[in-house]
Amino acid sequence: MVKLTSFIFFLLFWCAGCNSQIPETESVEEIAMDNTNFDTLTKTIHVFVALADNQYQGIVPVPAKIGNGQDPNNNLYWGCGYGIRTFFKKSSEWKLLKTRKLDSIRLERLIFKHQTKNYYLVADAYDGKYIEKCTGDFLSAASGQLNDTIHITNTTIGIKGNSKLVSYIGHDGLMDFELSKLYENADGKKRDCIILACISKDYFAPQVKAAKANPLVWTTGLMCPEAYTLHDALSGYVNNESDEQIRTRAALAYSKYQKCTVKAARNLLVTGW
């Protein structure tokens, strides 16, 4: 059943332009710090990406090259033309500061700085085999159970639960497995979240409610979680637009790239409860 209800559109809408080269970046210092002291005037968006994986995820298989969850360079959600790395690198709104490998699970981290606003964007690509850990880390951040900081360009920024917004991108693994715990809010803070995965409102609702997070954009049906939806939603977010305006931006982007009606995109991408 799961295979019939996820990634069905990818057989029609997969991107051909994958980027097999790790992008060159400036030499920018990034140092792990303690998880409490950071510049609270500088805002962060942390994106957790579970790479598409034909072998380890319950998906309708996509072409092998873009469905290898151990190869971020060619993955549908990362190195392909509409993947996070390629799409945001080409954006005029964001500047890529650093690319690095973290460990055997988080295969690559990108750090972007917004060109005009005091926002950083941190995106982590998880080996598709570890989609359950990616999901858990996202929810740990959304609930304030997992907090961290990094030092970049003479600024210490908050990441994970210290972020203003956290996002999950990828297959909805909750269609395949059950998490071992409920990620309850740990600190009384409400974080915004964007969950771009199939039917995420239904599957993530209990966890998001327990985390006391604000579901800024999530989904009611099958969808293709490529980068343009997140990108355009964030264009509104960094300009302090309302939740509804941000949702509309996301829907317009999805309509444009998926060539569906705006009404269909708005029915798919919703905000709040």
List each language-model region with its residue ranges:
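C-terminal motif of bacterial Sec signal peptides marking the signal peptidase cleavage site
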Residues: C15-G17
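Functional beta-strand-loop-alpha-helix junction segments that form "active/interaction loops"
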Residues: P72-G158
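Boundary/activation segment at the start of structured domains
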Residues: Q21-W94
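Short loop/turn segments at strand-loop or loop-helix junctions that form parts
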Residues: H46-Q55, D124-Y126, I169, G221
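Sec-dependent signal peptide recognition
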Residues: V2-F9
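Sec/Tat-exported extracytoplasmic proteins
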Residues: F88-S92, A142, L146, G170-G173, ...
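Caspase-like cysteine protease fold
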Residues: Q245-W273
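Catalytic cores of nucleophile-dependent amide-cleaving enzymes
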Residues: G158-G236
